[in-house]
């Protein structure tokens, strides 16, 4: 279909041309004046639509109505769990945290719930259970860490004390090897020098031996003592 550009432009010009002013110059005539831009022209706004008209299938309309329901359409609401149902599900979860197909069907029949709803509840309950287990594990590890930290601090303090003792002993050994030791008291400080002292017991023994020998030698040289001791006395 061929379109005439010239004819369309002329139609638009004609459509938007202002009409002639009325003969009456009264101001009231303007209120009763009706302007029709499409007067005398076959051009209408509906003629601007080009291309084929796309019709939406009924199936898509139904899906859109289900996804985006309006006030007139009632959506199937999720059934809430009662306290008895929650207690039964909790007991079943405490017995076994994993849900198999047979137990799911059995619970759905007993509680009157959909199997999908039971599966979702078990999935959420397992997630909460795992989070609780992680919290408990964190608390226990935190307590163990605090105990180990305190023990480490105690060992560190003990090592510092032992190092101080070793340092003092090293200083004492150095002073002993140098020959002087300073002993600090409450009132004064005494300096002791290392002096080599001879054993007096050995000197005493040597002196006694020499003295005894002199006594024997003196008795042997004294004739009075020899005579008196060797010959008997006569009356």
From Swiss-Prot:
Tissue specificity statement from the Swiss-Prot or TrEMBL entry: Widely expressed.
DNA-binding region extent: 74-133
Keyword annotations from UniProtKB, A to Z: DNA-binding, Homeobox, Nucleus, Transcription, Transcription regulation
Superkingdom of the source species: Eukaryota
Family, similarity comment: Belongs to the HD-ZIP homeobox family. Class I subfamily.
Function: Putative transcription factor.
Protein name per Swiss-Prot or TrEMBL: Putative homeobox-leucine zipper protein ATHB-51
Originating species: Arabidopsis thaliana (Mouse-ear cress)
Lineage start: Eukaryota, Viridiplantae, Streptophyta, Embryophyta, Tracheophyta
């Amino acid at each position: 279909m061929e379109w005439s550009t010239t004819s369309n432009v002329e139609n638009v010009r004609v459509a938007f041309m202002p009409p002639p002013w009325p003969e009456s110059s009264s101001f009231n005539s303007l209120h009763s004046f009706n302007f029709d831009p499409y007067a005398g022209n076959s051009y209408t706004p509906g003629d601007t639509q080009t291309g084929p008209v796309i019709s939406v299938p009924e199936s898509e309309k139904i899906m859109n109505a289900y996804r985006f329901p309006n006030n007139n359409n009632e959506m199937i609401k999720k059934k809430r769990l009662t306290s008895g149902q929650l207690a039964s599900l909790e007991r079943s979860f405490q017995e076994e945290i994993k849900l198999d197909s047979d137990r799911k069907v059995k619970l759905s029949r007993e509680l009157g719930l959909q199997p999908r709803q039971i599966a979702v509840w078990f999935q959420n309950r397992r997630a909460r259970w795992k989070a609780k287990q992680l919290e408990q594990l964190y608390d226990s590890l935190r307590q163990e860490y605090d105990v180990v930290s305190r023990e480490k601090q105690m060992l560190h303090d003990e090592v510092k004390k032992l190092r101080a003792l070793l340092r003092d002993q090293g200083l004492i050994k150095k002073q002993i090897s140098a020959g002087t030791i300073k002993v600090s008291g409450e009132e004064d400080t005494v300096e002791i020098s290392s002096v080599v002292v001879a054993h007096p017991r050995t000197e005493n023994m040597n002196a006694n031996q020499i003295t005894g020998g002199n006594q024997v030698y003196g008795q042997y040289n004294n004739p009075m003592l020899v005579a008196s001791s060797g010959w008997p006395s006569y009356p």
